[in-house]
Amino acid sequence: MTAHLIDGKAIAANLRQQIAQRVAERRQQGLRTPGLAVILVGTDPASQVYVSHKRKDCEEVGFISQAFDLPSDTTQQALTDLIDRLNDDPAVDGILLQLPLPAHLDASLLLERIRPDKDVDGFHPYNIGRLAQRIPLLRPCTPKGIMTLLESTGQDLYGMNAVIVGASNIVGRPMAMELLLAGCTVTVCHRFTKDLAGHVGRADLVVVAAGKPGLVKGEWVKEGAIVIDVGINRQEDGKLVGDVVYETALPRAGWITPVPGGVGPMTRACLLENTLYAAEELHK
């Protein structure tokens, strides 16, 4: 058996097409064009690439994109003032603060400064709290994108044993809440977990988001399981690999995401989806 590939690139392209169509319809109806403000502090190369992709995505779907490229020595107060200004700007539906920030800045305080109805990354405690209370509003982009990928398989998640490897605030923890909402029995593994192989081996669905290349061995995977690999790691030869050993997982899994081309494109597409939702439902 060889796993079915979950093509995140194609699914994300379809989602962007739907968003672009809705933006065009809004224009025809005389409604405001959705706006996204992207804040980048410093010159981190990976962050610069991510931000350029997000700006291109905005252009593709017809959003108005505002770019704020700030120097590395930008102060906490200057960033706070900028966020306050964007919070009050009716043309801005979403505010994205690109992480990581330089060490002298307090990311938690700045993320909390973003108005919850403009928090299109879904990181604000208010939005995480709503997800925990089973009344999600703006949902964290990567877990939201993963749920769309899972829906594309047509598999019924109710009652599945789901294992998440990695307990970050960005992926692991909100992913656990998403899968609970979907009716899964959820186990979250982390750096102190004993017998990781045993947990993975019992899972009908595995989501791996640890940032460690090859952490999950293919032979651990249960026959027919769904494998979602969030990891994206660059090797010395320049090749991008995930947190799962893809070659050995492929013949065992029922469904699997490739790296690259799996989860990453969906994270970006869901940022656009959240921005459109904010424009249509929260900023009427």
From Swiss-Prot:
Gene3D superfamilies: Leucine Dehydrogenase, chain A, domain 1, NAD(P)-binding Rossmann-like Domain. NADP(+) binds at residues 166-168, 232. The keyword Repeat does not apply. GO terms for molecular function: methenyltetrahydrofolate cyclohydrolase activity; methylenetetrahydrofolate dehydrogenase (NADP+) activity. Its EC number is 1.5.1.5, 3.5.4.9. It catalyses: (6R)-5,10-methylene-5,6,7,8-tetrahydrofolate + NADP(+) = (6R)-5,10-methenyltetrahydrofolate + NADPH; (6R)-5,10-methenyltetrahydrofolate + H2O = (6R)-10-formyltetrahydrofolate + H(+). One of its GO terms (cellular component) is cytosol. CDD domains: NAD_bind_m-THF_DH_Cyclohyd. Disulfide bonds: none annotated. GO terms for biological process: L-histidine biosynthetic process; methionine biosynthetic process; purine nucleotide biosynthetic process; tetrahydrofolate interconversion. Keywords: Amino-acid biosynthesis, Histidine biosynthesis, Hydrolase, Methionine biosynthesis, Multifunctional enzyme, NADP, One-carbon metabolism, Oxidoreductase, Purine biosynthesis. Pathway: One-carbon metabolism; tetrahydrofolate interconversion. Pfam families: THF_DHG_CYH (PF00763), THF_DHG_CYH_C (PF02882). The keyword RNA-binding does not apply. Belongs to the tetrahydrofolate dehydrogenase/cyclohydrolase family. NCBIfam families: PRK10792.1 (NF008058), PRK14186.1 (NF010783). Catalyzes the oxidation of 5,10-methylenetetrahydrofolate to 5,10-methenyltetrahydrofolate and then the hydrolysis of 5,10-methenyltetrahydrofolate to 10-formyltetrahydrofolate. Homodimer. This is Bifunctional protein FolD. It comes from Pseudomonas entomophila (strain L48).
